[in-house]
Every structure is written in structure tokens, then in C-alpha cells.
Design a protein with these regions (language model features):
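Mature extracytoplasmic or organellar-lumen-exposed domains after removal of signal/transit peptides
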Residues: 1-159
Length: 159
């Protein structure tokens, strides 16, 4: 199907419902698996979602849809992503491999957040849309690697 405003509205509603369901699943997982490292796995998993959420709200703003709420959500998601990244970086629980994954995520994150907030003009935002999509995928890959490293059996081995 070709992109349309009606399709974008439908996607918005569906993705918000999916995000709520995913958040509930993560909370249930953390409740069952009370190890401290599992909390970090959940946080890193949320980073994946937040990276995609920021791109989604960027695109909504560039299309003139949900402009004020999208701006608020975009800024909230960036603040949350940044705070969680710092929290994981400061954790004494992470291994050398996780620290390397965090460094890679930080390298991918900086240019992504810069382009997300480079302009509030929808025309300029649309001109940067392909770059946002590319950088979003790079951040997503880096967050996936972080989750993989945190969930690795070697991360769970006693020091």
C-alpha cells in the first residue's frame, strides 16, 4: 500500500497499542526474573523501542500529523533514551563486551539525536527523512547488540 494520512493514523494507533503490550510483557519478565542483570536487559530492550519511537514521531512531525503530541513524545523519548543509556553505562554489573556495545551505541546515538532535532520545519525534516531512517536503523542494530551482550551467558557468570 502507498503511504497515506489515513494509513499513518492507523499505524499510530496500532503502534501505541503494541508499545503498551510490549511494556507490560517486559514488566512481567522482570517481575519473574528478579536478577539485577535482567533489569538491565529490560532497559536495553526498551532502548530498541525508543529508538524506533523517535523515528516514528519525527516522521509524524515531518508530515504535519500529531504535531504537538509528536514533538512532546519525541523529546520525552530522547530524554528517556539518554537517561537509560547513562544508567546502563554506569552499572557495575556490565562486562567488557557490554561496555564495548555501549560505546558503539553511543557512537550511533549522537548523530541520530542531532538529526532528529536539527530542525522543526516540516520541509527540512522531510529532506532529512532518509538520513533519519538510516541512522534509526543503525541505532536499532546497536541496541540489539547491547541486548544480546547483556543476555549472553558470559554476562551472567559470576565474576
Amino acid at each position: 500500500l502507498a503511504p497515506s494520512q489515513a494509513g499513518a493514523v492507523e499505524l499510530y494507533d496500532a503502534s501505541e497499542a503494541l508499545q503498551q503490550a510490549a511494556h507490560s510483557a517486559v514488566l512481567a519478565y522482570v517481575d519473574v526474573n528478579a536478577a539485577a542483570i535482567d533489569h538491565l536487559v529490560g532497559l536495553a530492550g526498551r532502548q530498541r523501542m525508543l529508538s524506533q519511537r523517535m523515528a516514528k514521531f519525527y516522521f509524524y512531525r515531518s508530515w504535519g500529523l500529531y504535531d504537538a503530541p509528536a514533538e512532546i513524545e519525541l523529546r520525552f523519548s530522547r530524554a528517556h533514551f539518554t537517561a537509560v543509556l547513562i544508567q546502563i553505562e554506569k552499572s557495575p554489573l556490565v562486562s567488557t563486551q557490554v561496555r564495548a556495545a555501549l560505546a558503539q551505541l553511543r557512537r550511533e546515538w549522537e548523530p541520530y539525536q542531532q538529526v532528529l532535532f536539527a530542525s522543526r520545519d516540516p520541509v527540512k525534516m522531510r529532506m532529512n527523512a532518509a538520513r533519519v531512517a538510516r541512522l534509526s536503523e543503525r541505532v536499532l542494530a546497536a541496541t540489539e547488540n547491547l541486548v544480546t551482550q547483556l543476555a549472553a551467558p558470559s554476562q551472567r557468570a559470576p565474576s
